[in-house]
Amino acid sequence: MESGTSRTSDTGGTGRAGSTETSGSGDIARTLELLWDTGRRPSRGPKPTLTLDRVVEAAVQIADAEGLEGLSMRRVAAELGTGTMSLYRYVPGKGELLDLMLDRVQRPSENPADLGDGGWRAALEAMARETLALYRRHPWLLQVNQSRPILGPSAMDGMEKVLTLIRPMGLTDPELVSAIIMIDGYVVGAARSQLYQQEAERRTGLTDAEFWRAQVPMLEKVLASGRYPVMASLSEDTFGPDFDHFGFGLQRILDGLEVLVAQRRGESAP
């Protein structure tokens, strides 16, 4: 998430269920050195022909196009027109590279306006929508179990920005973090659902509208039988594409937090 919170995702970027990679699976100390740029730099030898930044960018582009199943050190080397062994001068292996990729794509926006008008509710809503957009841009993120994230600059910067805006809620520190995790989990579920729909269309060749239209004749007979009176009474737009299910659910979560915030303020009032 662009706020930098931890998360666990369990679907593939190509619609395949189950995480295929785990963050923090490489050398943790070395990964942190690379993320925070604190490692020793060689003072002798030929000047490197690549940069770590180029290696990470190439890896992200491959994952965006092919999913994590298409990512390997050899594949990245081929993309950069170099030998596989030359990459190990910049990054120890695929595990560390993955954590660098996560930090790269989850870099928070530097524009303060992107987190709303400065209020906690607007900040959490903006965070949720930005995170959903992030999964759409980089669906391979849903292939990574991020329950134990490596805390690089992007994670820390993002969390700092969001916590700064939501601290006035008056909740305890664990509750503030829990609110972020709760919203992040909601976003992951929504992103997963959208990816499954895209994968179903790709595999069947039927659009969502075509799929449901094929069921209409039988459903009309079933609903006319009187067996399902409540479902038969539903309006025609009940299952239509125009209703913003994501926005509706997000607002209800924020409404619940609003109640808690008001309750805490009432408890602290003289």
From Swiss-Prot:
Entries under InterPro entries matching the protein: Homeodomain-like_sf, HTH-type_TetR-like_transc_reg, HTH_TetR, Repressor_TetR_C, Tet_transcr_reg_TetR-rel_C_sf
Extent of Low complexity compositional bias: 1-11
Keyword Transcription regulation among record annotations: yes
Highest rank taxon of the organism: Bacteria
HTH tetR-type domain: residues covered: 49-109
Annotated control of activity: Daunorubicin and doxorubicin can induce dissociation of DrrR1 from its DNA complex. Ampicillin cannot release DrrR1 from the DNA complex at the same concentrations.
Region of interest called Disordered, as start-end residue ranges on this chain: 1-28
Gene Ontology molecular functions: DNA-binding transcription factor activity; transcription cis-regulatory region binding
Residues annotated to bind DNA: 72-91
Biological process annotations from GO: negative regulation of DNA-templated transcription
Gene3D superfamilies: Homeodomain-like, Tetracycline Repressor, domain 2
Chief location bin: cytoplasm
Keywords: Cytoplasm, DNA-binding, Repressor, Transcription, Transcription regulation
Record note on disruption phenotype: The transcriptional level of drrA2-drrB2 is significantly up-regulated in the drrR1 deletion mutant compared with that in the wild-type strain.
SUPFAM superfamilies, A to Z: Homeodomain-like, Tetracyclin repressor-like, C-terminal domain
Annotated Gene Ontology cellular component terms: cytoplasm
Compartments in which it is found: Cytoplasm
Pfam families in UniProt: TetR_C_1, TetR_N
Main function: Transcriptional regulator that modulates the expression of the drrA2-drrB2 genes, which encode an ABC transporter involved in daunorubicin efflux, in response to intracellular daunorubicin/doxorubicin accumulation. In the absence of daunorubicin or doxorubicin, binds directly to the drrA2-drrB2 promoter region and negatively regulates expression of the genes. In the presence of daunorubicin or doxorubicin, DrrR1 dissociates from DNA, leading to the transcription of the genes.
Protein name: HTH-type transcriptional repressor DrrR1
